[in-house]
């Protein structure tokens, strides 16, 4: 197909509205709002079900009382907070904001508390793995439920503290005749905008991944000389943790960092602004997906957790049959008893994430 223009005809003649109007970074996204909303709904349902199921199993099974289980429970709770903000963001995509300024700040708070606490708990779990494998003797003293609870409370406090500067700038304002909930910075507040962007980059990526890298390099060095089945599974899972976290969070942080460079006029131009706006939305959707994948990575892969999940499922089925006045099939009952016995034998083993 020939895209050559006629002589003496400019791009403005072909696209007068685009070149005469101010640079609009959002126009590229308006046609995709409905698709984004559908995707957000799918992520909400999957994230709500997955993380709720993790919490149900961890709270419902009395055998899950290790420090790892405490971190898993808090990680699922942080992802659930993140998930609860999605319906409001979906509504904000399709229609104007009708929930008021206070709710605008609350929803943004849920989003960022979920974001920061999730990254912090991933980091804390990595440090816990590092202690358990590299410093096994010392870990016996510190890897207790009370220490895990205290550290979890500290993580939540740190996440709330990191969120407060971001919440301050969220407000409801009119955009194209519609009320929207978004971060609003006056021109003299550019330094605050850059501060919040760099805060997300530093606390949401650079610091956690520096700790992750150190922990997992030391873990792999420690495990290199003893590759039995459990050790091999631990190495694979460690690599999965690092790679998946990078895949989901690095793109968004890079796009946010480049946006900061554009605000500093290091990067400039209308086309650059439009590409960055599109990149922020696309990478944000990718990062949203992480709240659905976490239950798979940190829970469903674990053999111990899968056994307890099956126990919960079988017990639920037995209660349903009992409520209906029927008995469970003999084969299912035998499988349940066998599963309980295997679970009791394996409960003394330390669970590998």
From Swiss-Prot:
Entry protein name: C-C chemokine receptor type 8
Gene: Ccr8
Lyase recorded as keyword: no
Disulfide pairings: 104-181
GO function terms (MF aspect): C-C chemokine receptor activity
Compartmental location: Cell membrane
Family: Belongs to the G-protein coupled receptor 1 family.
Tissue-specificity statement: Expressed in thymus.
Cellular component aspect of the GO annotation: plasma membrane
Extracellular topological domain residue ranges: 1-33, 92-105, 170-200, 262-278
Organism of origin: Mus musculus (Mouse)
Transmembrane intervals: 34-61, 72-91, 106-127, 145-169, 201-220, 237-261, 279-302
InterPro entries noted in UniProt: CCR1-9-like (IPR050119), Chemokine_CCR8 (IPR004068), Chemokine_rcpt (IPR000355), GPCR_Rhodpsn (IPR000276), GPCR_Rhodpsn_7TM (IPR017452)
A Pfam family of this chain: 7tm_1
GO annotation (BP), single: positive regulation of cytosolic calcium ion concentration
Keywords: Cell membrane, Disulfide bond, G-protein coupled receptor, Glycoprotein, Membrane, Receptor, Transducer, Transmembrane, Transmembrane helix
Residues glycosylated per entry: 8
Topology of this chain in the membrane: Multi-pass membrane protein
Major subcellular location class: membrane
SUPFAM superfamilies: Family A G protein-coupled receptor-like
Cytoplasmic-facing ranges: 62-71, 128-144, 221-236, 303-353
Role played: Receptor for the CCL1/SCY1/TCA-3 chemokine.
